[in-house]
Amino acid sequence: MSDAVHWTLEVSVNDGQLSTFKDLLNEMVSSTRSEYGTSIYEWYFNEDESICIINERYRDSRAAMMHLQAFGSFAERFMAAVTPTSFIVLGNPSTEVRDGLSGLNPRYLKLESGFSR
C-alpha cells in the first residue's frame, strides 16, 4: 500500500476577494514548490472563478504535516478570502495529520486497490 496522502479541497471565493485570493495562491504555490515530498499542488477554477479546487498529494504523512505547518503563515488570509465547501482526504494519514485537518471537517477515504506510476 502507498504511504501517499492526497486531498482535494473545494472552496467558494468570497465576494470581492478574487484578486486577493489569486495573489495569495501564487505566494502559496511559490512557498510549496520547495517543500519536501509535495508531488502535486494544483489549483483549478470554474469558468466564472467563483469556485476553486485545490488538488494536493504528499509522499507521506510527514510531508503532509510539513505542509500543514507551513500553511499556518497563510491560514488567516486564506480563510478570509474563501469559504471551504468540501474536503476529501485520500489515503491513510497519521493521527497528527488528521488532527491538523480536523477544522475543515474532512471526509476520509482509504485506498482499496489500484496503483499510480
Positions of predicted regions on the chain:
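Short S/T/G/P-rich N-terminal loop/turn motif that feeds into the first structured element of a domain
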Residues: 1-52, 59-70, 80-117
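A short, acidic, amphipathic alpha-helical segment used as a generic capping/interface helix at domain edges
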Residues: 72-76
